[in-house]
Amino acid sequence: MKFCSQCGALVARRTPPGDTHERFVCEGCQTIPYQTPKLVIGCIPEWEDRILLCRRAIEPRSGLWTLPAGFLELSETTAQAAAREALEEANAAIEIGELYSLYSLPHIDQVYMFYRGRLLNLDFSPGDESLEVQLFS
């Protein structure tokens, strides 16, 4: 980050008064553009004793199998995001269950949340970000 999104002045890394972390601070208007981890939300779509996985069509990890997941959008709950990602990546309708896992990956500034989800039917197919989708035991 080089310039302030509020006034366009240069920003510098320093510890603001009363803070404990070094942050970018605008040298003009003193705005602090806080940088926080991204939330990645997903679900574990279940049908009987099987799990629905998606083979990625895009980077990162193109061609590998994964659970449907993606970034939380503004104005949505984490449960809504989990259901949306299953719909976008696997055209799968699911009922969101309990939170299954929550873990931090500080080396890439991300926090992952996965919910259990029950597939409502077997009418699923690859979305734009998936090469194929399949149930696995």
Regions found by a protein language model. Give the residues of each.
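Conserved hydrophobic/aromatic beta-strand scaffold that supports enzyme active sites
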Residues: 3, 23, 44, 53, ...
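Short connector loops at helix/strand junctions that flank enzyme active sites
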Residues: 21, 36-40, 46-48, 60-62, ...
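Flexible, active-site-adjacent loop/turn segments at secondary-structure boundaries
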Residues: 31-32, 63-65, 70, 122, ...
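Conserved Nudix-box catalytic region and its N-terminal flanking loop in Nudix hydrolases
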Residues: 46-88
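Unchanged
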Residues: 72-137
